[in-house]
């Protein structure tokens, strides 16, 4: 493999045995592609805004004299960029402008004669835009729209599995689900009648809907039944015989023909009898007259002479009726063929319970069911039925629905109309009856072929359509009312309903979620999440076990591991690494094509439906060099089952071993050795890891780390190759390679880095350059590391030296013992940034004022504020300190004489305002790193606001000027080259000022043209700079758009440095989590023979019962990696020759059995080898891909190469006594994470605080500064001990005895430790409640 200069800095040794056939796809494409589809112009109008407009427009007036037509739309430029939107707390969005055409027709003239056309562009609200990382900035916070897994539109056949009826009879049903419109359900009842429900209303006999579709009884019977024809000849009754229909019946008479008895009376008819009848060609037999009694007539029979109806269709025949029919001259009688086995008389029975007889009565019945209480008229009933399933405005199956519908009914074409037809409804009923008759299967609702993904774009389009439909009504009204001559499209469209619908979706939909921004992995996982909840989806309470379970079709589409624990388990899933959605929204996964037992590199994406028809081999099947399967029998999956197939039968093979898992699970090394429950916890806990101060790449990884770090968008990635021309903490400048430049540009790329910004979870986002000056860069190289990334690889935690052993009970119940060295080296120190806001409003009594002049506050408290009353940057503050001084006017109160005197002496100020300053919350301390002041338009800015503005302007100017200088330098370098090649000496040029170069003339015409082009570019650059500067100046100096009634907002950002301490939660990547019990001095920690103490001691009992052996293998492999690093370090210290170093590193990379990765260090220069060695000396990073990882043998070989015992265990000594421990201990390096469950956020102790109004008991919870609840079980405990006084104290003065507690407070202050308990307030509440029931209860004092 060819490595770029940057990649050569540190190469991860890969133990993967299977070659990577398919690169890992861009991990955020599900979000970006979907939204792109929504906003891009689509000429066909299949999806996105275009589809929404086309489905609603043109809007015609009620009279038909005018219509409003849609022409096109365009999205404007957003006012602020993403960062500005976050700072200002506004939505990152673009204005939508739509070109509409109002066409007015002549009234008297023939149809279609146009009188007038007016075209105009109309503003239709703002559409939030997606940032390049797949998020939305809504009101200043980053949000993610989670994709939804919902039931695909189409038709589904299902059964109740015998749960509905007490007899356990299985009742079948069919349900037609449209994309929008009413559902249509058909269901059997226990008596085998077929019923229909429209939109889950009351059920009606299913034949009503057929009558409403204009079918007569005879036509209905004709549709659903085969016929048996009886013929009356010479007073004998003959029956047309279809032998196959007799199977399984018992003959009620001798079946004979041509004098031969085929079946004797009362014998069961078998397949042998049927074959005999068919062989002899018997197609007609004589039957006794009684046989016809009870058969059902298939059509109406009328007496031709009198016109009288003898018997109607669906009537049972009797011998009397037969005689009448014979008299009237009917020689042939058609009856329905039914039996109990596989031709039930369901529709015939249903017709008997059907109260309607013709179309009108059926329509009226449907109208009564849909609109109870309204008087039905013929017109209303017809309209209602038409609009239910046959109107394109109200009903839409969608392309997916039609495709699923036609496939389910086994039709050939998959396209068609979005509304239902007669045939659609009758065929669904036929298939349902077939299933009831035992032909055909019910659908599996949890099959991924029946559930589809609805992503951002589609959901936004639906919301947008909802808004448009609301506007449509208003437009129709206006078109009918207004004076059309003066009316313009602008006057008819009100953008409010549209923007309200869109705003509501992005702001408060259940699927629009506050982005989980703990670390890069949690961001990526959140964007790839798939939820079955949300509007139109399931609810937690109703979702059963089946929906949540892993289904065979999840393979390669949805991760079977990563899902939350708790009530949402199985309802929220994660997309597998290689999965993507197809045009219909179904998930598909890639497979390699297999032809005649040879695996090709051709890759096909298959959806769950298509996959069912193939035999698919596992990714770990063994192949020879030509790609043939080595074994004759290969383990494969087919139709959801796994079994052995011969190699010729195989159609496809998995692409990769990590195909089945999600991104989160694919980062767990040795996942194959972990129990699934623990792997689930491991995958979930990686998302909660807090970015540490110094990121440390995992020694044992899976090779997915780079993909996650780059795709998450937290790193800065080179867009084009070049050379690093300038680098500092906040910007990187790349001089682009000549061959990658666009004509007519300076060829300079500038990357500005994000510095110390707050994330959604209050962690710190900060980018640091990881390239040096003059280094060559290729496209896609990582230039700067973000939070939790190290040299472009994901680094969520730290590599810690761990020992598995008990240590004085400090690791009881998963507790973790940590060495003090970990704290001293700041291994798990994290920075958290908190945003505190102070809002100054306009109150009824006057405006609140932000000022340093606060009543009743000492000098000391104001020492950190400037003259505007705002804390200065860099101040170190603790709980209770004032950050922003603010006073609120308070109402006039009746003053006491003393106060009046004071006011007379000292003036007004003190008492008409109260202190409402912003203070640091209790238990928080940190450093102020930034202050922002937002002032309403028209309100005078205070001194601090002006200072900040000045600073921002200076910074913006400096940035833009530097940018311009860099671009100028690049441009003048090219001008210099042109001039020198044009014959002008370089020395002369150096004496001229640069601006004069452009005035020089060259004899060579080509060169002169080039020079003129460059001069043009220079002018353009200058004017562009001026424009940018003006825009920046405008943005910075303009007032802010604040909520009504708000005058000023001051935001203060506090950075809090948190070291690791007892009570913090830590975890490995295998679900091995625990709480730190003690920080132990280094000298007390166990140490090895070299005197190296361990960092962390873990409990060995945490492994066997949990079955996550992956952590042990990781520990061993980590030790080996570290051992090799130490050997390299020793060689570097000795300053060995580069050749020896190269040889040793090459040996390490070559280790392993038929490993795919080939690293050839002979192609590296000596400097590159030294730089590689420098990066490897802390340990050689290793990748062990999921299900394709390092074997036990390889781990032992690596340990040996690192000069370590192959058992992975070493002798340790007790740090306190220096004695050797009795047996050897497993010691190694494990990657440990610090999770975002920090004791600082949870610890809380109440002194005195607020009380509940009714019960007067202290509130609960940290947010309310509440107390600890002493509940009834605790009361029982004290009662059991007979601790009467303690109990009394708990229930009175420590809780809700109002007088007692104030008195006690006074006593304690006076040094008198007595208490006098009185009546608890809750007892009074109880009395009041009893009185409210009408029982008078009074307390009498003795």
Swiss-Prot record:
GO molecular function, a single term: DNA binding
Has UniProt tagged this entry with the keyword Nucleotidyltransferase? yes
Biological process (GO), any one: DNA-templated transcription
Which keywords does the record carry? DNA-directed RNA polymerase, Nucleotidyltransferase, Transcription, Transferase
Q: What class of enzyme is it?
A: transferase
Q: Which reaction does it catalyse?
A: RNA(n) + a ribonucleoside 5'-triphosphate = RNA(n+1) + diphosphate
Note whether Aminoacyl-tRNA synthetase occurs among the keywords: no
- What's the EC number here? 2.7.7.6
What Pfam family does this protein match (any one)? RNA_pol_Rpb2_45
Q: Which GO terms describe its cellular component?
A: DNA-directed RNA polymerase complex
- Fetch the PANTHER family from UniProt: DNA-DIRECTED RNA POLYMERASE I SUBUNIT 2
Q: How does it assemble?
A: The RNAP catalytic core consists of 2 alpha, 1 beta, 1 beta' and 1 omega subunit. When a sigma factor is associated with the core the holoenzyme is formed, which can initiate transcription.
Matches recorded under HAMAP family: RNApol_bact_RpoB
What does it do? DNA-dependent RNA polymerase catalyzes the transcription of DNA into RNA using the four ribonucleoside triphosphates as substrates.
Q: Could you say which protein family the record assigns here?
A: Belongs to the RNA polymerase beta chain family.
Protein's name according to its UniProt entry? DNA-directed RNA polymerase subunit beta
Q: Which organism is it from?
A: Yersinia pestis bv. Antiqua (strain Angola)
Give me the gene this protein comes from.
Answer: rpoB
């Amino acid at each position: 493999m060819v490595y770029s200069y940057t990649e050569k800095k540190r190469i991860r040794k890969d133990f993967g045995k299977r070659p990577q056939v398919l690169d890992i796809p861009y991990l955020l494409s599900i979000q970006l592609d979907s939204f792109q589809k929504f906003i891009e112009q689509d000429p066909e109008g299949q999806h996105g805004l275009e589809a929404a407009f086309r489905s609603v427009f043109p809007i015609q007036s009620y009279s038909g004299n005018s219509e409003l037509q849609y022409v096109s739309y365009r999205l404007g430029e957003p006012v602020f960029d993403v960062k500005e939107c976050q700072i200002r707390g506004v939505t990152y969005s673009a204005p939508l402008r739509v070109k509409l055409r109002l066409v007015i027709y002549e009234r008297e003239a023939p149809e279609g004669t146009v009188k007038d056309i007016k075209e105009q562009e109309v503003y239709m609200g703002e559409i939030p835009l997606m940032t390049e990382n797949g998020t939305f900035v809504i009101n200043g916070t980053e949000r993610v729209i989670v994709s939804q897994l919902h039931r695909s539109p189409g038709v589904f056949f299902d059964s109740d599995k015998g749960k509905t009826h007490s007899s356990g009879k299985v009742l079948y049903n069919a349900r037609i689900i449209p994309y929008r419109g009413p559902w249509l359900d058909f269901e059997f009842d226990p008596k085998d009648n077929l019923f229909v429900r429209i939109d889950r209303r009351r059920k009606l006999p299913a034949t009503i809907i057929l009558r409403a579709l204009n079918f007569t009884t005879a036509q209905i019977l004709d549709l659903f039944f085969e016929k048996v024809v009886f013929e009356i000849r010479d007073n004998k009754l003959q029956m047309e015989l279809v032998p196959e229909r007799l199977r399984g019946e018992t003959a009620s008479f001798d079946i004979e023909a041509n004098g031969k008895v085929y079946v004797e009376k009362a014998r069961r008819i078998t397949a042998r009898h049927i074959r005999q009848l068919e062989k002899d060609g018997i197609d007609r037999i004589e039957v006794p007259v009684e046989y016809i009694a009870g058969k059902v007539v298939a059509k109406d029979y009328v007496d031709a002479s009198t016109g009288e109806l003898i018997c109607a269709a669906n009537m049972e025949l009797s011998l009397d009726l037969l005689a009448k029919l014979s008299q009237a001259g009917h020689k042939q009688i058609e009856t329905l063929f039914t039996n109990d086995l596989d031709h039930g008389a369901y529709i015939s029975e249903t017709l008997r319970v059907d109260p309607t007889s013709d179309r009108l009565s059926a329509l009226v019945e449907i109208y009564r069911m849909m609109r109870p209480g309204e008087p039905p008229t013929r017109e209303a009933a017809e309209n209602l039925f038409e609009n239910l399933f046959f109107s394109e405005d109200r009903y839409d199956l969608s392309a997916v629905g039609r495709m699923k519908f036609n496939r389910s009914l086994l039709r050939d074409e998959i396209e068609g109309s979005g509304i239902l037809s007669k045939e659609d409804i009758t065929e669904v009923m036929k298939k349902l009856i077939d299933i009831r008759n035992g032909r055909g299967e019910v659908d599996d609702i949890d099959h991924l072929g029946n559930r589809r993904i609805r992503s951002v774009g589609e959901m936004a389009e639906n919301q947008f359509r909802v808004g448009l439909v609301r506007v449509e009504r208003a437009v129709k009204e206006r078109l009918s009312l207004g004076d059309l001559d003066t009316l313009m499209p602008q006057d008819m469209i009100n953008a409010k309903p549209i923007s309200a619908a869109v705003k509501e979706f992005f702001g408060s939909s259940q699927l629009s979620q506050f982005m989980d921004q703990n670390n890069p992995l949690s961001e990526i996982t959140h964007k790839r999440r798939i939820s079955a909840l949300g509007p139109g989806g399931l609810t937690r309470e109703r979702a059963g076990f089946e929906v949540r379970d892993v289904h065979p079709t999840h393979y390669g589409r949805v991760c079977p591991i990563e899902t939350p624990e708790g009530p949402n388990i199985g309802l929220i899933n994660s997309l597998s690494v290689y999965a993507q959605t197809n045009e219909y929204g179904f998930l598909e996964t890639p497979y390699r094509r297999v032809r005649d037992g040879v695996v090709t590199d051709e890759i096909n994406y298959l959806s769950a439906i298509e996959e069912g028809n193939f035999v698919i081999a596992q990714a770990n099947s063994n192949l020879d060099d030509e790609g043939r399967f080595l074994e004759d029998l290969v383990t494969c999956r087919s139709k959801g089952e796994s079994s052995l197939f011969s190699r010729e039968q195989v159609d496809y093979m998995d692409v990769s071993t990590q195909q089945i898992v999600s991104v989160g699970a694919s980062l767990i090394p040795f996942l194959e050795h972990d129990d699934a429950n623990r792997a689930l916890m491991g995958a979930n806990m990686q998302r909660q890891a807090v970015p540490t101060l110094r990121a440390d790449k995992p020694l044992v990884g899976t090779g997915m780390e780079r993909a996650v770090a780059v795709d998450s968008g937290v790193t800065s990635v080179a867009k084009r190759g070049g050379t690093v021309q300038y680098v500092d903490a906040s910007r990187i400048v790349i001089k682009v390679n000549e061959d990658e430049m666009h004509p007519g540009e300076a060829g300079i790329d500038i990357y500005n880095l994000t510095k110390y910004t707050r994330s959604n979870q209050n962690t710190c986002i900060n980018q640091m350059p990881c390239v040096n000056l003059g280094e060559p860069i290729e496209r896609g190289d990582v230039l700067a590391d973000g939070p939790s990334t190290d040299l472009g690889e994901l680094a969520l935690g730290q590599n810690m030296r761990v020992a598995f052993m008990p240590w004085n009970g400090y690791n009881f119940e998963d507790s973790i013992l940590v060495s003090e060295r970990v704290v001293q080296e700041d291994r798990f120190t994290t920075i958290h940034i908190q945003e505190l806001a102070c809002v100054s409003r306009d109150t009824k009594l006057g405006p609140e004022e932000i000022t340093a002049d606060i009543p009743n506050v000492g000098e000391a408290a104001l020492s950190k504020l400037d003259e505007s009353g705002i804390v200065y940057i860099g101040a170190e503050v603790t709980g209770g300190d004032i950050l922003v001084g603010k006073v609120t006017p308070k109402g006039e109160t009746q003053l006491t004489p003393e106060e009046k005197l004071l006011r007379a002496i000292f003036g007004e100020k003190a008492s008409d305002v109260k202190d409402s300053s912003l203070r640091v919350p209790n238990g928080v301390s940190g450093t102020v790193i930034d202050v922002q002041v937002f002032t309403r338009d028209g309100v005078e800015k205070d001194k601090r606001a002006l200072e900040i503005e000045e600073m921002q302007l200076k910074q913006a100017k400096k940035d833009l000027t530097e940018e311009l200088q860099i671009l100028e330098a690049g441009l003048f370098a090219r001008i210099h080259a042109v001039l020198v090649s044009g014959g002008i000496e370089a020395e002369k040029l150096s004496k001229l000022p640069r601006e004069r170069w452009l005035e020089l003339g060259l004899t060579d015409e080509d060169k002169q043209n080039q020079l003129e082009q460059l001069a043009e570019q220079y002018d353009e650059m200058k004017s562009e700079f001026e424009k940018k500067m003006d825009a920046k100046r405008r943005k910075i100096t303009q007032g802010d758009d604040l909520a009504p009634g708000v005058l000023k907002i001051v935001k203060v950002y506090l950075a809090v440095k948190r070291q690791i301490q007892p009570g913090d939660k830590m975890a490995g990547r295998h679900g091995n989590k625990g709480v730190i019990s003690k920080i132990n001095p280094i000298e007390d920690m166990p140490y090895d023979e070299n005197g190296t103490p361990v960092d962390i001691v873990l409990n060995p009992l945490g492994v066997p019962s949990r079955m996550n052996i992956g952590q042990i293998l990781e520990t061993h492999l980590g030790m080996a990696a570290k051992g090799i690093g130490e050997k390299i370090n020793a060689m570097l210290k000795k300053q060995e020759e580069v050749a020896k170093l190269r040889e040793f590193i090459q040996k390490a990379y070559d280790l392993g059995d038929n490993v795919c990765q080939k690293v050839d260090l002979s192609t590296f220069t000596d400097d590159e080898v030294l730089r590689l060695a420098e990066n490897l000396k802390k340990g050689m990073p290793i990748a062990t891909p999921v299900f394709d990882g390092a074997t036990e043998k390889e781990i032992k070989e690596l340990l040996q190469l690192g000069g370590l015992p192959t058992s992975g265990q070493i002798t340790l000594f007790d740090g306190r006594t220096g004695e050797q421990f009795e047996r050897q201990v497993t010691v190694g390096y494990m990657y440990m994470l610090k999770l975002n469950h920090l004791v600082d956020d949870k610890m809380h102790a109440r002194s005195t605080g607020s009380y509940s109004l009714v019960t007067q008991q202290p509130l609960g919870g940290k947010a309310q500064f509440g107390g600890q609840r002493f509940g009834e079980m605790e009361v029982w405990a004290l009662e059991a001990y007979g601790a009467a006084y303690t109990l009394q104290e708990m229930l009175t003065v420590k809780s809700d005895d109002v007088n007692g507690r104030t008195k006690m407070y006074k006593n304690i202050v006076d040094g008198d430790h007595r208490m006098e308990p009185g009546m608890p307030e809750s007892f009074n509440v109880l009395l009041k409640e009893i009185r409210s029931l009408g029982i008078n209860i009074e307390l009498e004092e003795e």
